Amino acid sequence: MEGERKNNNKRWYFTREQLENSPSRRFGVDPDKELSYRQQAANLLQDMGQRLNVSQLTINTAIVYMHRFYMIQSFTQFPGNSVAPAALFLAAKVEEQPKKLEHVIKVAHTCLHPQESLPDTRSEAYLQQVQDLVILESIILQTLGFELTIDHPHTHVVKCTQLVRASKDLAQTSYFMATNSLHLTTFSLQYTPPVVACVCIHLACKWSNWEIPVSTDGKHWWEYVDATVTLELLDELTHEFLQILEKTPNRLKRIWNWRACEAAKKTKADDRGTDEKTSEQTILNMISQSSSDTTIAGLMSMSTSTTSAVPSLPVSEESSSNLTSVEMLPGKRWLSSQPSFKLEPTQGHRTSENLALTGVDHSLPQDGSNAFISQKQNSKSVPSAKVSLKEYRAKHAEELAAQKRQLENMEANVKSQYAYAAQNLLSHHDSHSSVILKMPIEGSENPERPFLEKADKTALKMRIPVAGGDKAASSKPEEIKMRIKVHAAADKHNSVEDSVTKSREHKEKHKTHPSNHHHHHNHHSHKHSHSQLPVGTGNKRPGDPKHSSQTSNLAHKTYSLSSSFSSSSSTRKRGPSEETGGAVFDHPAKIAKSTKSSSLNFSFPSLPTMGQMPGHSSDTSGLSFSQPSCKTRVPHSKLDKGPTGANGHNTTQTIDYQDTVNMLHSLLSAQGVQPTQPTAFEFVRPYSDYLNPRSGGISSRSGNTDKPRPPPLPSEPPPPLPPLPK
């Protein structure tokens, strides 16, 4: 296999006699003209490759295909403008960057006929072009014998410059010369890639007035690259290269960096609008100072940084080095080093983007350091390209840390603002009962307040459970009333006593279930006296029905926040802990006393209501408005109470309430109300624990509310009693 491979490799290297007897020569093409045709085809491939956005490796591979093709075929039979698109189409597939046939044809048309509009894809001309390109691709494959893997000199340039620890200037110049050798000479047909690499490095050494010292073994650097290379061969090929450069027209010396074109297009509008002429003159001056070295330095800026990873990879390494120098320098265009420099606006990428173009004025004795300095001036992107990843990270570590600190400070400020606002709301809530009302309901709350003031406390408390039960129908107005009542009770202890009296009256009317009331009353006396206020419900005694339904509602997140927590905690946005904390500490002693003395009485009736919600709902069937609320509540309270039995508290109810508290707690923490959360957790357990008992105890009152609750709601404050007889 290796022998066959060597023979195949030898097949594509020709002697001078063979080159002089090429098919084109046999068809009467002048030697200089043939070389010019090759250079033009390479120039077209470079232009198309940039427009198609393929890597420089793909472009170089296509150029080698073209050179080899014309050692078998003649330019007279296959014009270069026809073969180049097919060669690039094939190379793109070989290098795993395939492009659509339609795109290749359109780009070729744009490069060859920039003034004409693109052909219609349905036209005969376009279909003919498609057919011709496909046929030419097949011909190229057969001509090349399907030998599509190409070894480029760039890989060996990178290896050698690493080996001798060459400076960046030297490495960049050598790499640039390797690309020029493909575009402008037939070295790829005469010498192996290692030999061409030695020629490029040797030329770069002369260019930069640099001499690579002899190794400690007494060997010259090129002996480590290719043993067949001699100093005489290097001098001969260098001289030939320079002669070709002198003969080559300026328009064929331009080798673009396709990424530079994109960067130039982005800045073209700004540059053209501001000072196009001035910038052009400035760049021309800089180019005249150190033209080719500048370009080479820019193109090669990444080669040295990538060399560390490259040495062991022949093809992939070569591609990486190619891509390195070409693709990673956005601000540069490739210009082959030439004795004279010209910017010609006739070619595709030659608009005022010439900012990125670098002409090459070949004065060999130029100093590499000057070239590198001017290269820094010409290309803003080069410095960044030269920095290794570690250096870049170290360089920007402080900036990143500062940015991170700024972000953290901003986040902390936002959280503190949220916490401050929440605390203000809570403090305001403690002092002013009206603030406790749920924010979204405030609008509707105002019109209702006068009416609520007129309404009896009993009616308000009865509404509280109704609001909880009648979630869909009258949740909003009832919640408002309930909250008003809650705050009034918290601020005025007399209101609690009045409500107790009212509830007693209702209790007398609904004496049907005293036993249950007594049972629940026990829990209410010692637990609800403290948990009532924290809950922040109407008069802090939302009946068991209400709380059971509310807690079950908590499971229904839609209503849980609107009904249950609107009544049990001031607002979803305010920390339940804060509100409860404030309410509990402000009034717990007083209300506990009042609730103990008074809740015993009114809590009894409310508890029976909870125990017999179904019966009560049937009793209140006559009540148009309150009955549906009771009925809807019945299932929830029943479900909650069923397992609880004596206390009328359900473990599921407790869990639901706990889940809701946890959810609100997470919401508060998300908003940054961190200070209040510890208190929230202190009361979460008592909340749920007392809530269920309270459901029993408070249900005494709220049970009252539940039973009586249907009547008051329909007729509101004045007519609550009339509906009951009905």
UniProtKB/Swiss-Prot annotation:
Basic and acidic residues biased stretches: 487-506
Cellular compartments annotated: Nucleus
Positions of post-translational N6-(ADP-ribosyl)lysine modification: K485
Which key words are in the record? Acetylation, ADP-ribosylation, Cell cycle, Cell division, Coiled coil, Cyclin, Host-virus interaction, Isopeptide bond, Nucleus, Phosphoprotein, Transcription, Transcription regulation, Ubl conjugation
Q: Which residues carry this modification: ADP-ribosylserine?
A: S416, S474, S475, S531, S549, S552, S563, S637
Q: How is it modified after translation?
A: ADP-ribosylation on serine residues by PARP1 in response to DNA damage disrupts the phase separation activity of CCNT1, thereby preventing activation of CDK9.
Q: Give me the stretches of Pro residues compositional bias.
A: 710-726
* Chain positions of motif Nuclear localization signal, and interaction with Tat-TAR RNA: 253-270
Modified residue annotations for ADP-ribosylhistidine: H487, H530, H556
Q: What does this protein do?
A: Regulatory subunit of the cyclin-dependent kinase pair (CDK9/cyclin-T1) complex, also called positive transcription elongation factor B (P-TEFb), which facilitates the transition from abortive to productive elongation by phosphorylating the CTD (C-terminal domain) of the large subunit of RNA polymerase II (RNA Pol II). Required to activate the protein kinase activity of CDK9: acts by mediating formation of liquid-liquid phase separation (LLPS) that enhances binding of P-TEFb to the CTD of RNA Pol II. (Microbial infection) In case of HIV or SIV infections, binds to the transactivation domain of the viral nuclear transcriptional activator, Tat, thereby increasing Tat's affinity for the transactivating response RNA element (TAR RNA). Serves as an essential cofactor for Tat, by promoting RNA Pol II activation, allowing transcription of viral genes.
The record's comment about this protein's domains reads: The histidine-rich domain (HRD) region is intrinsically disordered and promotes the formation of phase-separated liquid droplets that enhance binding of the P-TEFb complex to the CTD (C-terminal domain) of the large subunit of RNA polymerase II (RNA Pol II).
Which family does this protein fall into? Belongs to the cyclin family. Cyclin C subfamily.
**The name this protein goes by in its record:** Cyclin-T1
